[in-house]
Structure formats: C-alpha cells, structure tokens
Amino acid sequence: RTLLRAYKFNENTNKYKNLFYVTRIYYAFLALANTDTYGDMPFKEYVQAKIPETNNVAYNTQAEVYDAMFRMLEQAVDSIKPNDATQIGYATDDICYHGDWNKWLRFANSLRLRMALRISNVDPARAKEEAQNALNNQYGLMQSNEDNMQIVPKYAPVSQGGTDDGGNEHPLVMCSVCYNGESVMSKDLENFYRCLLYTSPSPRD
C-alpha cells in the first residue's frame, strides 16, 4: 500500500512503471494464495491503497478477487517493457528474479494459467479465455527451473543467493534456510519429553 501511494503521488512515474507493475504481479501472487486458502477476503480497498476508515473492512467474494487478479496480471504484462532503457532497474534489491523483467512476465503468465485452471469447473468460458491469453502472450510461460520464482532473503548463505551477513539471522531462519530444513530434535530432548509423558500426573490427580 505504501509503495502504491508513493507511486501515485510521484511527479515522474513513467520511469518506475516496470517496478510498479512487478509489485502488482507479486501482489496477485500473494492474494491468490490467500483467497485459495480462505475464500472471501478484504481486497478492493487494499489493492487501491486506501486506508480503511474502520476495522470492519468489507470482504470481497472469491469470484471478485479472482476477477481483479486477472485484470491486474493482464495490465502488468501489457505495461512492463523489458527493453525500455528509461526504466529504473533494481537488480540488487530483487530477491526473486534479480531484476530480470522477462522472468517476471513469464511468471505472471504462468499465474494467469494456474488461475484459469482453478476456475475451469466454475466458469469454463472465462477459464478458456484467460488460459488462451496467457498461452498466446508474446513473453510465454515459465520454461524451466531457471524461471522458478523463489524468495531468497539477503541473510541466506551466498551459495543460495543471499549475502550471508553472518550472525544476524533469527534462529528459525537458521533452521529453515541456512540448514536447508535438515534440523531434527536431539535424542536427549526426545527422551526428555518421553519421560515427561510417563511421569506427569494425570488431570484426575
């Protein structure tokens, strides 16, 4: 929301168009995960960078959210110009695709196709239209693992694309990122909890 408001009130928005529409792709990506999990959700006010007047924010139906996401992705794909030298780049701050506009565009089209498949049993006509738009777009779809969208935090090891700033990581990050998720409970700790199970008094006691 802050970025959208900054973009709206900037006197020279033309050179930031690619950056702005990348955020729309990412916004749709996050919204898709949320609406697929929870269904109806607050969306309209937030996507327009409005500040709700109360905590009782209106919910949009899942159909409305999907419709908005389709339009967001279509607008992003139509607006991002990979070869426009006047656009401000951000390779060092892009923790997903390192400033590669074409990969963002392929990711957007792939999201459109995924969404079309999701609604194919609910709205076949809309699904067919959106799928064809994604498949026929000039930038294409994700082609290989090189196009995978991954979020690599800067504190991740250099081998994983981070900067490995050494020592500032949260312990959970160390377990999930730095140790590749290969962290297990020690045998001593396992036995400790097992002993508690047998020695703890029952609720009746």
Where are the model-predicted features located?
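Structured, solvent-exposed acidic/aromatic patches
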Residues: 1-200, 204
